[in-house]
Curated annotation (Swiss-Prot):
Recorded catalytic activity of this chain's protein: a 2,3-saturated acyl-CoA + O2 = a (2E)-enoyl-CoA + H2O2
Record gene name: POX1
Pathway(s) the chain acts in: Lipid metabolism; peroxisomal fatty acid beta-oxidation
Naturally occurring in which organism (per UniProt): Candida glabrata (strain ATCC 2001 / BCRC 20586 / JCM 3761 / NBRC 0622 / NRRL Y-65 / CBS 138)
Keyword Flavoprotein on entry: yes
GO molecular function: acyl-CoA oxidase activity; FAD binding; fatty acid binding
GO biological process annotation, one example: fatty acid beta-oxidation using acyl-CoA oxidase
Keyword Lipid metabolism appears in the UniProt entry: yes
Localization annotation: Peroxisome
A matching Pfam family: Acyl-CoA_ox_N
Enzyme's top EC category: oxidoreductase
Recorded family membership: Belongs to the acyl-CoA oxidase family.
UniProt-recorded name of the protein: Acyl-coenzyme A oxidase
Primary site of residence: other
Top-level taxon: Eukaryota
Length: 748
């Protein structure tokens, strides 16, 4: 890094890098083993390192401090350049996968999608690029979103709702899967409706004579709103609209609607589009609004895997709907984004944990006694309580994020295989898996995006005034992040819907003994009828003696909370009246799943990849601290529902929590170094690896705000300032008195 300061770093009284270096010298854990644990396995770890190295060194993709000063227009232009670069990476990533997994000529398949001898692109083909997209989200969320809307929303909507022929046409023949030919957006949300998809108002009316659909926006509230990519770039959209045939409303279905000519980007007839304007963050995304006025599309542009319209020339057109398949469509539509947001939570959380921890170790404030050195922030007990639990949050998220991602891909592969073959028996099984996947993805997405939003802001505050600087990532990071709490399912709505499904499962298990051990063992072991009976018949108090107790206590908490809600709803017949507690069920379920997945991975002799005893001990401390921290946060509920007694909270939970903090503090630098984020990924000078906080920070500020001979330079509004400061007495009268008279009164 070019040093722009004239100050000799060796002459500084404050030398924060020496504290960082001392922490690393005293490290007792194997950060390579921890990193492998966090990245799931050695192969995933190596791929992550390779991609991260490529991203931070790519002259177009890389981020630097200049990003924080860019205007909205500049951000959008830069983002498009980065999309073009990522498209090239995509082709290379697919070639790499096929070289290892498929004996086919990739170049031929890229050029000739009509060749039926060439296998279509699959999730496996996109595996490397999907990881690349996940990692670039940590550096540039708006870039990943721009591509994610096209591939993840537009593309997955077609894959989830289209027939095999439609999938091949739109994604391969038209080139969408390779970000070629067409560029898609996802028109679900309307000005008047978001979460309540069933009440969307845009219409798609079938015209039998022309064998087309006519798309219309019936009123202002039906305007498609918040549509990423719509304002300037999308050529097509996956439009959610009400299917109207012969005057009958068949509910909301999906249609591919052309918006612009791909060659000229001119709007198609009947399309009106605008930019929705200023947002909290992610200005590189051209969010827009769309209105349709008698827009005509062919019947074949309706995605027809689950619902088909038959023209029946000379007779009345008919609509074929398979209720089971239509239900599956409802579960699969937005799963990809929710699943990926759990992984985003791990990566984004680890980024800001790294920045704040390095600052806390390097920063000094106040001394115990005059003449003594100032203490490091991290050595204050309160600061430890504020920072260290935030470090362990991404640790506990990681195994659950990878597990959920694997569950998503395997379930979707089963769905596509079963629906393509119209295998009804297989569809019954996969529909149950999809329901469980919906519960887990909704609960984990909501809980973890909330956790990371709180993490970013709390850690920003722990960095004091420097955390407020735009150059230290927290401001943009928070503004870019918090949309995750709203889009692709508002967190409260997702929490309620997942909790209602969990409540139904609980009632079925507790009253009817209904429990599918094979399907539910992954996330719902606490709903096993035998475990339910044990919890409610045992007279012994819950303890935290064994390692698994730190997970099991959340299973007990869930059951007691669910029983309370079930009794309340049975008495009041008012499920909405239990909404506050239902949101808590979703949070507790997420915490249970995360702790259970972490426990199983670390406890596995083959899957943890941790062989160093001291390293494993510290990772168990991470696990215990997470559980204790959130028990303490929910101490009121744990006492209210008699999960733990007040004495257990005050004499066991809280003392253990406080005792663990100094243990985690000893390894706080090594624990955050284990994430292995290079400076280019952090883009926050107070968190750079070398720990030279003040020089790094000062240099980035001066680089982006060059010092002139007149200091910061004469401002363009200097005349306004000068006129104010040099105004005559006639501008400064107070009650008829001049300045001299006022001054004489004040000095008497």
């Amino acid at each position: 890094m070019t040093k722009l300061s004239t100050v000799d770093p060796n002459a500084s009284v404050l030398n924060p890098q020496r504290f960082i270096q001392r922490e690393r010298e005293n490290c007792s854990i194997d950060i390579d083993q921890v990193n492998t644990f966090l990245e799931s396995d050695p192969r995933s770890r190596d791929l992550t390192h390779l991609i991260v190295d490529q991203l931070v060194n790519d002259p177009i993709i890389k981020a630097d401090s200049a990003t924080y000063d860019q205007t909205k227009l500049t951000q959008r232009e830069v983002t498009v350049k980065k999309i073009a670069r990522m498209a090239l990476y995509m082709e290379q990533d697919i070639k790499t996968v096929r070289k290892h997994f498929r004996d086919t000529d990739l170049l031929k398949s890229l050029q000739d999608f009509g060749d039926t001898t060439t296998p279509p692109l699959t999730n496996k083909d996109l595996a490397i690029f999907d990881k690349r997209l996940s990692l670039v989200a940590n550096m540039d969320p708006q870039l990943s979103t721009r591509i994610g809307v096209h591939l993840g929303l537009f593309g997955n909507c077609i894959k989830g709702n289209g027939t095999d022929e439609q999938i091949k046409y739109w994604l391969q023949t038209r080139g969408a899967i390779l970000i070629k030919g067409i560029y898609g957006c996802f028109a679900m949300t309307e000005l008047g409706h978001g979460s309540n998809v069933a009440q969307l108002q845009t219409t798609a009316t079938y015209d039998q004579e022309s064998d087309t659909f006519i798309i219309n926006t019936p009123d202002l509230a039906a305007t498609k709103w918040w549509i990423g990519g719509a304002a300037h770039s999308a050529t097509h959209t996956a439009c959610y609209a009400r299917l109207l045939v012969n005057g009958k409303d068949y509910g909301v279905k999906t249609f591919v609607v052309p918006l612009r000519d791909p060659s000229s980007l001119q709007l198609m007839p009947g399309i009106a589009i605008g930019d929705i304007g200023a947002k909290m963050g992610r200005d590189g995304i051209d969010n827009g609004w769309i209105q349709f006025r008698n827009v005509v599309i062919p019947r074949e542009f309706m995605l027809s895997r689950f619902t088909k319209v038959h023209r029946n020339p000379g007779a009345t057109p008919t609509v074929e709907v398979d209720p089971q398949l239509d239900q599956i469509s409802g579960y699969s539509a937005l799963l990809s984004g929710r699943v990926n947001m759990v992984m985003d939570s791990f990566r984004f959380g680890s980024k800001f944990a790294t920045i704040a921890t390095r600052y806390a170790v390097g920063r000094q404030q106040f001394a115990d006694k005059p003449g003594q050195p100032e203490k490091q922030l991290i050595d204050y007990p309160l600061h430890q309580y504020r920072v260290l639990p935030q470090i362990v949050i991404p640790y506990i998220i990681s195994p659950a994020a990878f597990s959920l991602l694997n569950f998503y891909y395997s379930t979707l592969d089963e769905l596509y295989a079963a629906s393509s073959k119209n295998d009804k028996r297989a569809l019954v099984v996969v529909s149950q898996k999809l329901k469980n996947l919906f519960i887990d993805s909704a609960s984990l997405k909501a809980t973890n995006t909330w956790l990371v939003a709180q993490l970013i802001d709390e850690l920003r505050q722990t960095c004091g005034g420097h955390g407020y600087s735009g150059y230290n990532a927290f401001g943009k990071g928070y503004n870019d992040w918090v949309v995750q709490c709203t889009w692709e399912g508002d967190n409260n709505i997702l929490s309620l819907t997942s909790a209602k499904s969990i409540l139904k499962k609980f009632v079925d298990s507790a009253t009817k003994g209904k429990y599918n051990k094979e399907l539910d063992k992954r996330s719902f072991r606490y709903l096993d009828p035998q475990f339910i009976r044990k919890v409610f018949t045992s007279s012994s108090e819950n303890k935290l003696d064994d390692l698994y107790d730190y997970t099991n206590i959340w299973a007990v908490a869930l059951l007691k909370l669910l029983r309370h809600i079930a009794k309340q709803v049975d008495s009041t017949k008012d499920l909405d009246g239990a909404s506050k507690l239902l949101v808590l069920v979703s949070k507790f379920h997420a915490l249970y799943v995360m702790l259970n997945t972490y426990y199983e991975k670390l406890n596995s002799p083959t899957d943890s990849y941790v062989t160093c005893p001291k390293t494993k001990e510290q990772l168990w401390n991470v696990y215990k601290l997470f559980s204790l921290y959130f028990i303490d946060k929910h101490a009121g509920e744990f006492q209210q529902f008699k999960i733990l007694s007040p004495d257990q909270i005050s004499q066991v939970v809280q003392p253990r929590l406080l005792k663990l903090l100094p243990e985690i503090r000893k390894e706080c630098i090594s624990l955050t170094d284990s994430f292995k984020w290079p400076d280019g990924m952090l883009n926050a000078p107070i968190g750079y690896y070398d720990g030279d906080i003040y020089h790094n920070y000062f240099n980035e500020v001066v680089k982006n705000n060059p010092v002139e001979k007149d200091g910061a330079g004469i401002p363009p509004y200097h005349e306004l300032l000068a006129n104010m400061l040099t105004r005559g007495d006639e501008f400064a009268r107070l009650g008829g008195a001049n300045n001299a008279e006022i001054l004489s009164k004040l000095t008497k």
